[in-house]
Amino acid sequence: NGDVVEICYDNAKSYAGKSGLLGWDHLAVRTKDLKETMAFYAGLGFNMTGNGYLDTPDGRLYIAFMTCKGFTLELIQLVGPAVNDPDTWKSGKIDHISLDVQNVQDAFMEARSKGYEMVDFGIKELPLFDHGCRFFTIKGPNGEIIEFNQINKF
């Protein structure tokens, strides 16, 4: 589909000491058919590491996490009356970039203090993984959505 993602590791390393950034967390990809997409990535060597759903005002959001050699994909399919063709989504097939943080509350306060364009005005929680996760999102300089994510350990 022409989407290209490049991660600059050296720049992320120098930023990590300031914000508790631990590194890459996952890349979220929107899909029309979750099962077909999961089968495709399984064929490439990815294994399912988590799944679930979230009811939203737009419909039910089905989510699957698949991992291969430390790289995690979040596959997303929205089912419901407000669903439109993924080819018309403004952000393309790649929904967001997610970064793993040590303390999501500290990262949130730092993002606000730096004047980043906040997409979420508070920290959200999802009942995914063993103990859930907490996250918030900002917009990058090109309109890309960047999620700061902390997976709860207990």
Where do the model's predicted regions map?
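Conserved short beta-strand elements that form part of the metal-binding/catalytic scaffold
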Residues: 2-11, 49-88, 138-152
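N-terminal beta-strand motif that seeds the catalytic metal site of vicinal oxygen chelate
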Residues: 8-38, 44-50, 94-99, 149-154
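A cross-kingdom feature marking solvent-exposed beta-strand/loop segments within repeated
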Residues: 16, 54, 80-89, 93-95, ...
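Residues that flank catalytic or metal-binding motifs in active/ligand-binding sites
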Residues: 23, 62, 69-71, 93-95, ...
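Core segments of cupin and vicinal oxygen chelate
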Residues: 29-72, 106, 113, 129-131, ...
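Short proline/glycine-enriched turn/loop motifs at strand-loop junctions of beta-rich domains
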Residues: 101-105
